[in-house]
């Protein structure tokens, strides 16, 4: 039951319910050039949003639960209400969901998006490095999440990119999450502070020392930390294999 509540708390974007930034601040415009804003049309025709991040000129990494009938990626954005000159809007050619993804324990919540064309790298649009397969981020590390998600449980999603600093927790802090698995997931956010990713932030990155170690996956419906992020290092071989065969 709790796993289902968690899933409801961050199943997709603004309008369907996905992670967002609570307790954070507005980002300096274009200071996170790898950030991707995903405009999604679901199989039911709903329009929702997720986050993602650019890892090569033609691939964006995000959460598998951000899948949809159609996805358009906006790169180089800060305020998504505006047609900023820095923005590059590209449709997704192919959604590649991890073959072991299961929405009920929400394991392997990772997806690659192949863009219809390669992006132009600029000061506002650039890739972010991934960890090595053996590089596990450890408890106590301070990392950053960013996104255009909700800024409060009852608030709308943000038009401008926001970010929040979060602590990596020991796996014991996520004991309430029945299906949490250390090898595949990261326990993120101190329960003593209300700082979190929330609805609309799903699929966005967790940056530790400039490296994308996590993907916003799911959390409690009231946004109380900690939350669960997909552990990127575990999936680096899969990511590389997909890119090599799909390029």
UniProtKB/Swiss-Prot annotation:
Record function comment: This enzyme, isolated from small intestine, specifically inactivates the apo forms of a certain group of intracellular pyridoxal phosphate-requiring enzymes. It has chymotrypsin-like specificity towards small substrates.
The keyword Acetylation appears for this protein: no
- From which source organism is this entry? Rattus norvegicus
| Protein origin, superkingdom | Eukaryota
Q: Is Signal one of the keywords UniProt gives this record?
A: yes
SUPFAM superfamilies annotated for this entry? Answer: Trypsin-like serine proteases (SSF50494)
Q: Which residues form the propeptide?
A: 19-20
The protein here is known as Mast cell protease 2
The GO terms this record gives for MF are: serine-type endopeptidase activity
A single GO BP term for this record reads: protein maturation
Could you give one GO CC term from the UniProt record?
A: extracellular space
Peptidase S1 domain residues are 21-244
């Amino acid at each position: 039951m709790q796993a289902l509540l968690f899933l409801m708390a961050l199943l997709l974007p603004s309008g369907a319910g996905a992670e967002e930034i609570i307790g954070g601040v507005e980002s300096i415009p274009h200071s996170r050039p790898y950030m991707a804003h995903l405009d999604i049309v679901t199989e039911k025709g709903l329009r929702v949003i997720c986050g993602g991040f650019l890892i090569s000129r033609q691939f964006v990494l995000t959460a598998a639960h951000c899948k949809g009938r159609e996805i358009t990626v906006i790169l180089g954005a800060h305020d998504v209400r505006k047609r900023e000159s820095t923005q590059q809007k590209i449709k997704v050619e192919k959604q590649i969901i991890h073959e072991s993804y299961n929405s009920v324990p929400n394991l392997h919540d990772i997806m690659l998006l192949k863009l219809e064309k390669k992006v132009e790298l600029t000061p506002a649009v650039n890739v972010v490095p991934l960890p090595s397969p053996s590089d596990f981020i450890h408890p106590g590390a301070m990392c950053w999440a960013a996104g255009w998600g909700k800024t409060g449980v009852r608030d709308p999603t943000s038009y401008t990119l926001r970010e929040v600093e979060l602590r990596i927790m020991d796996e014991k802090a996520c004991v309430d999450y029945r299906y949490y698995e250390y090898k595949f997931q990261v326990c993120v956010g101190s329960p003593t502070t209300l700082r979190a990713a929330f609805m609309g932030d799903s699929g966005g990155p967790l940056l530790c020392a400039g490296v994308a170690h996590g993907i916003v996956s799911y959390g409690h419906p009231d946004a109380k930390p900690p939350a669960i992020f997909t552990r990127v290092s575990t999936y680096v071989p899969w990511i590389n294999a997909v890119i090599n065969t799909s390029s």
